[in-house]
Every structure is written in structure tokens, then in C-alpha cells.
Amino acid sequence: MRKSFYTWLMTERNPKSNSPKAILADLAFEEAAFPKHTDDFDEVSRFLEEHASFSFNLGDFDAIWQEYLEH
């Protein structure tokens, strides 16, 4: 079974980095409602679009998701 997106993303946390992946990881860590136990693209994408307390470039999210799938 694949790790959840959140679990994988947490390995990329780095407050000193300006990379989109590190930025999203830090924002997701601070967001209590971020979906932590899913590997479903639509669920995470919908959360980012409709419910997140932060804004994030969805084009960057798509690239990060692709990297997640390839890990």
C-alpha cells in the first residue's frame, strides 16, 4: 500500500527552502484539516481548491503529485 500523500510530503519539510514542494509541506503541516490519510488526487486537490486556509499554485501541486506517484 502506498504511503499517504501527507506522509510522503512531510519528508520534504524544510522551512529554509523556497521550493514549491517544501513550501507545500510546511503549509500542510500547519493546516490541521489537511487530509492526512489519503492517496487520492481528487480529495487532496479539492481540499486545496476549496478548503485550505492558504493558497497554493495548483500547477505546482500537479507536478508535486506526479513526483509523489513516481517515488
Curated annotation (Swiss-Prot):
<dbReference type="InterPro" id="IPR023089">
    <property type="entry name" value="YozE_SAM-like"/>
</dbReference>
<dbReference type="InterPro" id="IPR036806">
    <property type="entry name" value="YozE_SAM-like_sf"/>
</dbReference>
<protein>
    <recommendedName>
        <fullName>UPF0346 protein SPJ_0886</fullName>
    </recommendedName>
</protein>
<dbReference type="InterPro" id="IPR010673">
    <property type="entry name" value="UPF0346"/>
</dbReference>
<comment type="similarity">
    <text>Belongs to the UPF0346 family.</text>
</comment>
<dbReference type="Pfam" id="PF06855">
    <property type="entry name" value="YozE_SAM_like"/>
</dbReference>
